[in-house]
Amino acid sequence: MESVYNAEAIEKKWQQTWVEMGLDQTPEDNTKPKYYALSMFPYPSGNLHMGHVRNYVITDVIARLKRMQGHRVLHPMGWDAFGLPAENAAIERGIHPAKWTYQNIAQMRQQLQQLGLSIDWSREVTTCSPDYYQWTQWLFLQFFQAGLAYQKEAAVNWDPVDQTVLANEQVDSEGKSWRSGAKVERKMLRQWFLKITDYAEQLLNDLDKLPGWPEKVKLMQANWIGKSIGAYLEFPIVGMDEKIAVFTTRPDTVYGVTYVVLAPEHPLTPKVTTAKNKKAVEKFIKEVTSESEQERTAEDKPKKGILTGGKAINPFNGQEVPILIANYVLYEYGTGAVMGVPAHDIRDFKFAQENKLPIRVVIVPEDQQDQDVTLTQAYTEPGIMVNSGSFDGMDSITGKTAIIDYAEKQGFGKARVQYRLRDWLISRQRYWGCPIPVIHCPSCGTVPVPDEDLPVKLPEDVEFSGRGASPLAKLDSWINVPCPSCGEPAKRETDTMDTFIDSSWYFLRYTDANDQQTAFSLDKVNDWMSVDQYVGGVEHAILHLLYSRFFTKVVRDRGLVDVDEPFQRLLTQGMVQGMTYKNPKTGKYIPSSQVNPEDPKDPETGEPLSVFYEKMSKSKYNGVDPKQVLAKYGADTARMFILFKAPPEKDLEWDDADVEGQFRFLNKVWRIVGEYQSNHKSSSKKKGSLTKVEKDLRRAIHIAIKEITEDLDGEYQFNTAVSELMKLSNALVDAKCYESPVYTEGVQTLLILLAPFAPHIAEELWHTLGHSESVHLQGWPQLDPSALEVDEITLVIQIMGKTRGTIQVPSSATKEELEKFAFESEVAQRHLKDQEVKKVIVVPGKLVNFVVGK
């Protein structure tokens, strides 16, 4: 073997060999238990960053481990390839989105392959390929046929200069367009939705079926779904036949209503506004509706409102209360109206004070019966109902039920469960997305494109100006088609789908990625699903994971898959952070190349810099390019550092010194095998007659097997597993019994245990030992419990609780024998001398403590 570890040569060699061997191909043999390991697939930006590397290396270790443990493993990869960046590239660089995307995919695929990932590339999916989005469209039609896809008017971000719709991420923090700089307006457009609210209860309850998910992620999803149990109440409008419907979780406070608030967009707003208030109300509406939803609902956003002049009637006591509109009430949430109970709601209390609205107490603590108390803050706890008519004196918990019962009997309310979750708006007025496969006919209405006409392909002869309507909406040759139902002239839908649609089912496609006849066959999808281990960033904890769960339940109900949940276990890896230098006075970030780390100062001003770790990003100049790390150290070192530096769920702080440390460790493994090769000679010695050195080494080998297996089979503590590899390497260095079968066992075990972490060097050294079969095809080492047993143990000798020394004793010694060995030892005799031993405390396997008297 070569005397020097050459990572670059070894890694190129084995990556090519593995491809030729088909080592990473998914086996068809279903006699073995299946294991589906999956990383969240990337957007093809063109370059891997360290966050990608961490994600994919974690999954790769799991996939390699499971193969060695006897599973047939599915470990695929693909590309979440539709989206705005490609369309922006078309506008800015004059390159077609498809060309830009596929160039990036080729570049990133090569980078992934250089990491030595054991991916089955024959199952690669690309969401912008017609071969994939044909089935995205087919699945959309499954939703449509089930009544789960529909159109309605909805507010969008509108750029008045470019005359186009903007995604939320294209609107800056000041509510301006990313491109034109114009103040973004809110505009109503007819949009497509998926009825995820029909599955709200299932999505909430089935979180209990996911013990392998982090609790924080399940809590985030539960909060997003936002189940509320309360009442639906109707407030008549003075002088009108119509009523304002509100939802409340505190019906017990209804006698404390002193105003009602409508969303500015509510259809009743213009009707309840008096002529006197019309001008002011319209001005207020224009100001409010120009703001994005994010701006209006921000925690620190002042809650503003204005009187409409209209009044509503509290149906419980007949009192008239003013109707206002306010910026914090959104028409898309709940009923688009709320009842104001300032005495018992923190937000309402502040709003009432600012708008000089009355505050009426209707709940008081049990130990306080004063009904005329003046509040300095809202009382939001349970208590006793007061100022509440016939409900006075009732505890508020009981009062909730009583109020609802009364409202139901009187016909102006009922019990209701409401969810914060809203239906999923999937329309995008963009080009680079999956076309929505419907046709609008003047006679037949909305008609689905027939299955045999799928996919509806994106036209290529389009112009990308970034202004006006979507490029699709301007292309008459593509829009105008005959109606599939009646044959008369009709028009295609010009909206494309939210890219979250593409990523909501890709894990199903991987199970049957090359099927041209269907999205996935029932046999194959049921064979592989659910995903056993899903790995990705916590930033996807809500939307992507929730939408994927929703999709899975819908296709289950359509008879396309048998599972309830897509992902059995979820690992959300922490961020990769880089050393960051920032001038605290100017807020300017300084590239590390311009800073002396021993004395960090601004190179321009000489001012001291703040130094801290922060998520890697270009704008902060704190990123580390994976290509540079691979070029200097190789993929195996990069993998080892990523796995060793921090537990997978924690943030990882990049440290060049620790990278160097892992490189030194792999060089050490290289030397261990080299020295073994140089000094080992065949021996007929049996394991039965082992020396103490051999016994100690064999114990170290099986401790490593035990600890590493537990680390990987449990909570994926890769960092402690790498530590165990280091301990085993130290044991081999110390033992030096090269001709012993135990040493051979140790070297081979080290390489097999190392293989999932550093696959290239493990493979090279395995073959150096004379093996012809891949190290990755070896069975995972099995623990021999007898190897952990020891002949002798170290016994601590204490006098009056103070340690005076240690002795070696047989591990099988009884309590009485331990006392005898301890008393007769030189250590005890020297310290006890002529002292009288009053008591002896024996802790078997650990210590003997002598209590003496004067």
Swiss-Prot record:
InterPro entries: aa-tRNA-synth_I_CS (IPR001412), aa-tRNA-synth_Ia (IPR002300), Leu-tRNA-ligase (IPR002302), Leu_tRNA-synth_edit (IPR025709), M/V/L/I-tRNA-synth_anticd-bd (IPR013155), Methionyl/Leucyl_tRNA_Synth (IPR015413), Rossmann-like_a/b/a_fold (IPR014729), tRNAsynth_Ia_anticodon-bd (IPR009080). It is found in: Cytoplasm. PROSITE patterns: AA_TRNA_LIGASE_I. GO terms for molecular function: aminoacyl-tRNA deacylase activity; ATP binding; leucine-tRNA ligase activity. A motif ('KMSKS' region) lies at residues 615-619. The keyword Protein biosynthesis applies. One of its GO terms (cellular component) is cytosol. Its EC number is 6.1.1.4. Residues 586-607 are annotated as: Disordered. It holds the Pfam family tRNA-synt_1. A motif ('HIGH' region) lies at residues 42-52. It catalyses: tRNA(Leu) + L-leucine + ATP = L-leucyl-tRNA(Leu) + AMP + diphosphate. GO terms for biological process: leucyl-tRNA aminoacylation. The keyword Amino-acid biosynthesis does not apply. Keywords: Aminoacyl-tRNA synthetase, ATP-binding, Cytoplasm, Ligase, Nucleotide-binding, Protein biosynthesis. It is an enzyme of class 6 (ligase). ATP binds at K618. Belongs to the class-I aminoacyl-tRNA synthetase family. NCBIfam families: leuS_bact. This is Leucine--tRNA ligase. The lineage of its organism: Bacteria, Bacillati, Cyanobacteriota, Cyanophyceae, Oscillatoriophycideae. The gene is leuS.
